[in-house]
Amino acid sequence: MSLANHTFSNPSRVLQRNESLFTNKNILVAGNIDDEYPLQLQALANSSTFCFSDYRYYSVLKDKLTTSEVHFTDNYQGETKFDLLLIFLPKAKQETLYLLANLTPHLQPGASIILVGEKKCGIKSADSLLASYSNRINMIDSARHCSILHAELNQPVNAFTQSQWIKTYPLNINNTELQICSLPGVFSYGELDKGSELLLQNLPDKMSGRVLDFGCGAGVIACYVLKKHPQLSVDLVDINAFALASAKLSLQSNQLEGNVFPSNVFSDIKEKYNILLSNPPFHSGKNTDYTAAETFINQSTNHLKSKGKLSIVANRFLNYEGLLFKAFSNVKIDQESNKFKVLSCITKT
């Protein structure tokens, strides 16, 4: 992924109008970071620490933020006390609350808390998210359908305990019982989505070899196939730090073993697999984006062994069959519901 021609997002452009907020400050930055504006923040601040939850932007920016501390993390645990926290507002309210709970203990009393985001992400009502941290909350700018909220940290802050944020739910599909754990910021937080459920109900009875769970989320697919087929070797990948942490928790909760690591589609994958499984992501932050799913399909044959199989679930309106027919044989629809379809195919060689 290259950001060479990547323009600043609207939230970043609004921040550009207010850069005096960051001048000579010791800043902690997190949330929906999706452009190169961190480079400007680094230049403005006295010191800067960035907590990325999206592996794509972490991978591109980690070596450019040469004077900053840079983390890809679901749970920041540094020792520094900052005088400003900037959160690029995520789409999910629970993720914002989680970030505030995790990061405010690392602030000095009286520090600034700044939320920036678009109206469609809920910035207009985000002052309620800050109420337990401050009684001095102001909207200091609004433009490009975005706003900046500023709060002074003047309320007591509790120590952060990640376990309080984990939602665990039971799962029973085809007489296979599981406990799934998920953190805020993960797709279908705290419940099984209907697409993944349809995929699990229609996987083959026999599986062997090495399996990849692409876009693993909370690890539902991997946990299911490992419980059904303990002999499998399973890798789980995602770009989301909260998803990867959740997948590890789900594996542990079910006494299962899998290899969990970040990868932007196949960027960090060197193996070839017998089976690729996925409920492919089609959101990037707050926007609909099919790039990752299409890249996964287009490059999947490079990571499958001879006669390797791919099984995915997708919204019915998406024409993934057209992409699959280019590289696979025996492309078929295994099952359909009113919203989803399960597709499977085999490599041509």
Curated annotation (Swiss-Prot):
Disulfide bonds listed in the record: none
Protein name (Swiss-Prot/TrEMBL): Ribosomal RNA small subunit methyltransferase C
First and last residue of the signal peptide: none
Transmembrane segments annotated in the record for this chain: none
Keywords: Cytoplasm, Methyltransferase, rRNA processing, S-adenosyl-L-methionine, Transferase
A Pfam family assignment: MTS
Task performed by this protein: Specifically methylates the guanine in position 1207 of 16S rRNA in the 30S particle.
Family: Belongs to the methyltransferase superfamily. RsmC family.
Location of this chain's protein in the cell: Cytoplasm
Catalytic activity, as annotated: guanosine(1207) in 16S rRNA + S-adenosyl-L-methionine = N(2)-methylguanosine(1207) in 16S rRNA + S-adenosyl-L-homocysteine + H(+)
Entry-linked CDD domains: AdoMet_MTases (cd02440)
